[in-house]
Amino acid sequence: MKRSLGAKPLLFPTPVLVVGTYDDQGRPNAMTAAWGGICCSKPPCVTVSLRKATYTYASLMARKAYTLHVTDEPHLTASDFLGMASGRDGDKLGTLGLTTVRSELVDAPIIQEYPLVLECKIVHVHDLGLHTMFVGEVQDIKADARVLDEKGHLLLDALKPLGFMPEVRTYHGMGPALGRAFDAGKLHMPKKAE
């Protein structure tokens, strides 16, 4: 018998995303967020949800853009720090020795050391309660060559992305592929009459 866990945001794993913005002084800043993901295929859109109290919130409202960096295993501690410290208190990226370049497509920084980044223009803002959801239309995705195959597809084994388990606050790696989507379930499809 199943046990009730109550009403709470428990879907997992959530991606470990680093949101890049420029603050009101034009300085690059970044924070880690776990509330985010894909929300639309055409146009390609992703979301990230933040509390109004965060330093990044005002930057998103002012700049109408963000970059979304996918955290990989080598950047676990850096991403965790970016979620713990506030840009109000100092240069978090400088503390970590991370370098940025200005996106050519949106008014937000790209952190060079992260292997995968989505450049997003904010197209919708939804105040949901404690969090505000920022829907970003993806303008482009930049990826290091080492995480791509010869056709330009992402190699998860090379990327080594992290997932986050919200309830127990733990980071997890990704395992090997277990099957192909829209293929593994074919054995349950009814046979077509000949």
Swiss-Prot record:
Mind listing the UniProt keywords for this protein, alphabetically? Answer: Flavoprotein, FMN
Query: Does the entry feature the keyword Acyltransferase, yes or no?
Result: no
Source organism superkingdom: Bacteria
What pairs make up the disulfide bonds? none
Required co-factors: FMN
Q: Which GO terms describe its molecular function?
A: FMN binding; oxidoreductase activity, acting on the CH-NH group of donors, NAD or NADP as acceptor
Q: Gene3D superfamilies annotated for this entry?
A: Electron Transport, Fmn-binding Protein, Chain A (2.30.110.10)
Could you tell me what the cofactor note in this record states?
Binds 1 FMN per subunit.
The family database entries (SMART domains) matched by this protein are listed as:
Flavin_Reduct
Q: What does this protein do?
A: Participates in the reduction of hydrogensulfite from hydrogen.
Subunit structure comment from the entry: Homodimer.
Q: What is this protein called?
A: Flavoredoxin
Q: Which organism is it from?
A: Megalodesulfovibrio gigas (strain ATCC 19364 / DSM 1382 / NCIMB 9332 / VKM B-1759)
